[in-house]
Amino acid sequence: MAAKEIKFGRTAREKMLRGVDILADAVKVTLGPKGRNVIIDKSFGAPRITKDGVSVAKEIELEDKFENMGAQMVREVASKTNDIAGDGTTTATVLAQAIVREGAKAVAAGMNPMDLKRGIDLAVAEVVKDLQAKAKKINTSEEVAQVGTISANGERQVGLDIAEAMQKVGNEGVITVEEAKTAETELEVVEGMQFDRGYLSPYFVTNPEKMIADLEDVFILLHEKKLSNLQSMLPVLEAVVQTGKPLLIIAEDVEGEALATLVVNKLRGGLKIAAVKAPGFGDRRKAMLEDIAILTGGTVISEDLGIKLESVTLDMLGRAKKVSISKENTTIVDGSGAKSDIEGRVAQIKAQIEETTSDYDREKLQERLAKLAGGVAVIRVGGSTEVEVKEKKDRIDDALNATRAAVQEGIVPGGGVALLRSSVKISAKGVNDDQEAGINIVRRALQAPARQIAENAGDEASIVVGKILDKDQDNYGYNAQTGEYGDMIGMGIIDPVKVVRTALQDAASVASLLITTEAMIAELPKKDAPAMPGGMGGMGGMDMM
C-alpha cells in the first residue's frame, strides 16, 4: 500500500476551500444571460466553447490532491443537480461556494461545525417550503416557450421548438436533441418508442464520448426467454451478417457464453450488434415485447407460438431506421411496422384502460400507450461550424431539461430573485448561537446567484440586490439582458422550482459535508527509484580470479 499524506483541521479546510474556489470561479462566469464563455482545450480537434456549467466543472482536475478533493466535491454538486433537474448546475455551484466560504470562516472562528450544519439544514428546509408555496403552475404553450427561451440563454427559437415538441408528443413524451446536417435548427416528430433498459455490456457502445450505442437501419430480434448460448441462433446471425446490417437483440436476458460471444464478435468487427433486456416483468413483459414487435413489424420468438430460435428467418425480425441505447434507456426510432397494425394495438390498449379497475394497471397501460402513440420528437441542431453546433446543442439540452422540470413543479421568478426574496423571509430559529450562525450563512448565500448574474452583466452587484430588496413585490427583479427592473414573470424571466430547489438542496448537502471535514487523506506522489549506477570504464581486459 502506498504511503499517505494526512492534513488536519484548518490546514485541510484551507486546501479544500482553495480547490472549491478554483472550480467555482471557472463555472460561475457562465451564469445568467450575459454569462461569459469558457474555452476548453481538447486533446484532438478544435477547442470547445461552452456556457454550460456542468461541462466546465467536468473538465477540471487539479494537481494538488487536497485542493482537487474540494474541487471534486463541488463538481459532484453540479453533476447531481444536472442528473436530477437537468439544469441549474451553475446556480448550485455558486451556492455551494458561498456556503462553504462562510462556513469555513465560522469554523475558523471556533464555532461547532455540527451545529452550523443543523442551522444550514433548518434554513434550507424553510426556503424549499417557501419556493413550493410561491410556485406558479405552467399551463400554456407560451409559458413553456418562455422557460425554454430563458434556459437557452435568451434564444427565443429554441423555446418555441421545445414548446412545439412537447405539444406534439406530450409533456412526458420522448424528445431527443441531435446534430443536423444543415445550418438550420429544425424539429421533426418521428414514430418511436423508448423503454428503460440499457445495453447489457459497455462493449456494445459505438460512441465512447457519450457512452451510447447507435445502430442505423437495424434488424431487431425479440426473444421471450433467456439466451445463454448462441448455438441455436447461428442461422439467423449468419443471415444478418450477410446483409451487412446491425442487429439488436431484446430478450429476457443474455448471459454467460452468449453475451461473451456477442461482445467478441462486436470487438472483432464481424458483427454490428447490441443486446438489451426486455422491458417490464411477467405478463407485462410479454405485452411490451408484442408492442415492440408491432412497432417494428417483427415477431416475438416465443415457445407459446411454437417458434424455435433455430427456425427464425430474416422476415421474422423487426426493422427500425435507428436505435439509440444508453446505459439506462433504449429508443427505437421509425420502426417499420404497418400503420394499421399500430393503430389496432393503440385501440386495444385504450379499451383495456377503460376496462381496468386498478390504478397501477391503468398507469402502466397509459405508459405503453404513450410509447406506441406518442412517438419521438427530434430537435436537429444546425450551425455553420462544428464548435457552434456543439455549444448550441448543450444549451438546447439544458433548456429541454429545465422546461420538463417547470412542467413538473411550476415556476418562480428567475434571475436569482426567488432565492433573494426567500433570504429575507427565513424565520427559523436555532437552539444556540452556532445554529443561528448556520441559518445566517444560508441567508447570505441565497444572495450569491443574483449578485453573480449582475456581476457577469458588468453591473454593481450590491446596488442591484439593494434595489430589488427595496421593492416589496415577489416578482420584482433585474433583467440583466436589457438592464431594466420590473416584473420578472411579466418579462418572461422564470426559473423552474425543481431546478432552484435541487440546486439549493444539493449545494447545502455537499457544503455541509465540507464544513464538517476535520481530516483529509491523499496518496503521496511516488518517488522515482534511483537509477542503476553505470559500469566502470576501461576494465574490459581484467582476468576474473
From Swiss-Prot:
Biological source species: Rhizobium etli (strain ATCC 51251 / DSM 11541 / JCM 21823 / NBRC 15573 / CFN 42)
InterPro entries: Chaperonin_Cpn60_CS, Cpn60/GroEL, Cpn60/GroEL/TCP-1, GroEL-like_apical_dom_sf, GROEL-like_equatorial_sf, TCP-1-like_intermed_sf
Keyword line: ATP-binding, Chaperone, Cytoplasm, Isomerase, Nucleotide-binding
Pfam family, one: Cpn60_TCP1
One Gene Ontology cellular component: cytoplasm
PANTHER family membership: 60 KDA HEAT SHOCK PROTEIN, MITOCHONDRIAL (PTHR45633)
A GO term for molecular function: unfolded protein binding
Gene: groEL1
Name of the protein in its database record: Chaperonin GroEL 1
Keyword Nucleotide-binding listed: yes
Subcellular compartments: Cytoplasm
Enzyme class: isomerase
Lineage: Bacteria, Pseudomonadati, Pseudomonadota, Alphaproteobacteria, Hyphomicrobiales
Assigned protein family: Belongs to the chaperonin (HSP60) family.
